[in-house]
Amino acid sequence: MKRSSGILMAVSSLPSPYGIGTLGKAAYDFADFLKDAGQSYWQMLPLGPTSYGDSPYQSFSAYAGNPYYIDPDILAADGLLTAAECAAPDWGSDPRHVDYGKIYESRFTLLRKAYKRGWERDAEAIAAFAQDNARWLPDYALYMACKRHFGMKAWTEWPDDDLRLRKNEAVLDKYRTLLREDVQFFTYLQFLFFRQWTALRDYVHQQGIRIIGDLPIYVAMDSADVWAEPQFFQLDDDLVPKAVAGVPPDYFTADGQLWGNPLYDWDAMRDDGFGWWIRRIDGAGKLYDVIRIDHFRGFANYWAVPYGQPTAKNGRWIAGPGMDLIERLNGWFPQLEFIAEDLGYPTPEVAQLLRESGWPGMKVLEFAFDSRDSSGYLPHAYTPHCICYTGTHDNSPLALWRQEAAPEDVAHAVEYLALTEQEGFHWGIIRGGMSSVAELFVAQMQDYLGLGEGNRMNIPGTQGGNWTWRLLPGELSDALSVRIDRMTALYGRKA
């Protein structure tokens, strides 16, 4: 990875008249902005369909795209919708934040109109798309149709045990026939998503921009992935988890974090040649140029919490697949680059695995200025083979961090980076990352805009109000792109 820089910006955060960012004009405009600003990378959050809590890290599928991101204007230009139909629903009144409730109420109703007009018209192209994605699409479409049939209940709560347990092909065929219309509908939504995504990705590449995508290490229990292939997870005979994922107690959380995701049966995966992971990375490789593996430490060892425990306190560490998996992925995907999200308290096992993997790890500037202890996140401690971030989606924007952090930590940052009010606090922190030896520097869009309270993407461990932040129309000014471009060139990162 050559010396370069990029911007972290979720698709959901793009401006749009339809309540949430889409793969339409604003996405193309953002690619233009990145080019004008001298950037080389657009880092995104996961693109999958969101479920309870609206988190892109808890998706119904490791392969599918989020139907919310299908752009209505593109569908209208293609004759699948009318402008009046696109404008009719109430998409929410706050342009700064997504109202997921209103999106859920109206989006699928609108998209079903497009399906009614396009299913037969696009039959040949749909058939080709379905053939190319035969490994996951039929299970996903049936899973979503069944969820809708059973009132959006998790598959673990479906009343038909034969279907829940996938007893035989006959029961699956029964529901494919019973729910044929919905199976076709959810198939068509994926066809539309990937058609729009491919066009956008090609345009982004034409601008000289590469895409970094986030890959959550775990999949959601309520997902087509677990329902379709339960043999690769630590489940009992009734498909109830034996243990679930989380992290142990630490300085910040006395009870640890109980994520609740099912854990992988690494022995079963190893016996299968890690085929499940090869298929998953192959799917991600159709979306992204670089893949950031979230919670990389889970490949070294993972925290297993007995199912039913109210907190993560009573878990234990279990060895992960280590280099057996990583060597397999590196061998299968030489064209892809990986980033290891190795944040948290380092252990010798994780550090060794990172070195052996050859993947760059992460440095976060907001973690650098702890006045109580010397930090490996300070830029002078970097080696080039790393990725420097101002913060991730789980961090406050810099302007908000300045308000929340201990005064001594802010003072440490001011002294270390010679920050001044004339330059601007957030610009000085960005300068610290830009000037570092890290191969790649990435800043949140909120940080370039100097946004503070009310503009955080996610607060880990909380429910409600997360994943809603949006860019306002007009905030990507020419003056901003010029300033970013100048700093990018000054520190030798310009594309």
Where are the language model's segments positioned?
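Conserved, well-ordered alpha-helix/loop/beta-strand core segments that scaffold catalytic motifs
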Residues: 186-219
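Short acidic catalytic loops
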Residues: 42-46, 204, 210-216, 284-298
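Trp/Phe/Arg-rich N-terminal binding region typifying the photolyase-homology
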Residues: 1-82
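Terminal-tail/helix-coil boundary detector
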Residues: 474-495
